[in-house]
């Protein structure tokens, strides 16, 4: 059997608000998009007693045996949704970890989507929600890589054919611990995205929004503050925002030329930072 090839796109939070907290998790609402930056997953069914999962690429170094993909298969087998089939999976990692780009969660989401599409598993809606929750809060968002509003009650509303943006994604040599950044949350905002509409994805509207976690990450890591300030100074025709809990910062542009120009300036100034031009999908 030959490998199936899957593109696992990076997730970006164009805006994010913390609206409260349950006993375990913070309640969030977010404007979510996906960009052309992606990991490449090769998957095929094999005759074996166990799954074979391997990672390669620049951002594969610290991925251990307990990862989102192994967690997915463990849960599917525990719930007897996947009983006898075993798979070999090779992941080429292009999305940096601990960046707020959801690389690991999107890998699990795309493999889950593949298993459903190829009829290896057939979960009902309740089971699907349970699978996603068992792996990570972003996984449900990755089942359809499109512009999405995540409401504070965890409901997801998807939007097709939204205006696309050019983006410059930058990440310093360090990452942010999601747990650590969320532990710094001291106040909540009222839900603002409970009536989602396509106009929320307009450039002018997005410019007015923010990411509630950004101030915490920027305070903890002054270098992030400097990076954001540099990107904002480089162009007044863009807006700049951290994605997720960081440490990646994204600059949004209408013009590809402007995006490329700012990348050149940034690369000259911050030689040790990773940066990538991409586009929303």
Model regions: which residues?
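Conserved phosphate/ATP/ADP-binding segment of small-molecule kinases
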Residues: 59, 66, 70, 129, ...
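Contiguous, small/hydrophobic- and glycine-enriched helical/loop subdomains that border
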Residues: 112-152
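Short beta-strand scaffold segments in enzyme catalytic cores
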Residues: 16, 39-43, 140-142, 148, ...
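Conserved, helical-rich catalytic subdomain that frames metal- and/or nucleotide-binding sites
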Residues: 51-53, 144, 148-239, 252-257, ...
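Solvent-exposed alpha-helices and their adjacent loops that cap or buttress functional pockets
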Residues: 34, 134, 141-142, 159-163, ...
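ATP-binding N-lobe of GHMP and related small-molecule kinases
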Residues: 1-99, 116-127, 171
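Glycine/serine-rich anion-binding loops at beta->alpha junctions
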Residues: 92-117, 137, 239-253
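Hydrophobic C-terminal alpha-helix "anchor/cap" residues
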Residues: 32-35, 76, 132, 231, ...
